[in-house]
Amino acid sequence: MSLSPYLAFAKKSFLQKSAYRLDHWLGILNTLIRLVIYVEIYRVLYGGRTSVDGITMSMVITNFILSLGLESFFVVDDYYLSSRLYNGSIATEMLLPVSFHGRMLSDNLGTALFKLIFHFVPTMTVALIFFGIEAPASVPSFLLFLLSAILGYGVLWSMSFLFQMFSFWLLNVWAIMTLKNVFINVLSGSMIPLWFMPEIIRKIIGFTPFDSIYFTPVQIYLGNISGSELALGFVKQLIWISVLLIFGFMLWNKGKKKLVVQGG
């Protein structure tokens, strides 16, 4: 299978995003405002203390900066399929000699690359200047963090892929996408560091894919997990990517059989 068409789709998506400069700057501003709010809330909660239950304020700030940084370019289009079902273009796209899912991924990766260069980098630069973050535990930890971040994006994308398949049976998937994103925000550790969750809640979250998106990469960066626990974190990410994709393709195959195009 030639990668050329998918590279072209990714390039097109990259260039399309570059046309919306105001949206780009507002996105950076939004991320920085959220970061300031989160940090100030926890500074108040810490009440001048440097550590609470072994969790330092520096660790909390690092968690927020890295999580929001990753979130800024972890781009998925939750409505890619539903929009094409609604306007009828799905019928034409499925006839093209390229994988529909490959095109979906390519479009998202093109946007993610744009966000990485023009959103993540400047946001992280400003955050480092005004807040500072802990250095990675070691060079290997930083490299493993990058690998885990890639797998974290894989979990996020696969989850979106699965939920998008419900578009075949629902006229509007906004409600379930909103619910999914609420769970991601709360349970991934980006909004509330999972260190502060009750142990029973952390164990329950551990059986879900949510902490594999942001929290696992951050834990690796900080050197909080190593050895068998580190290996388990990677295995868990790979398992969730596989499980979500398997169920996603099962729904895709069922949905194609009863495809009803809304619109023209």
Where are these regions (language model features)?
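Hydrophobic transmembrane alpha-helices and immediately adjacent juxtamembrane helices
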Residues: 1-264
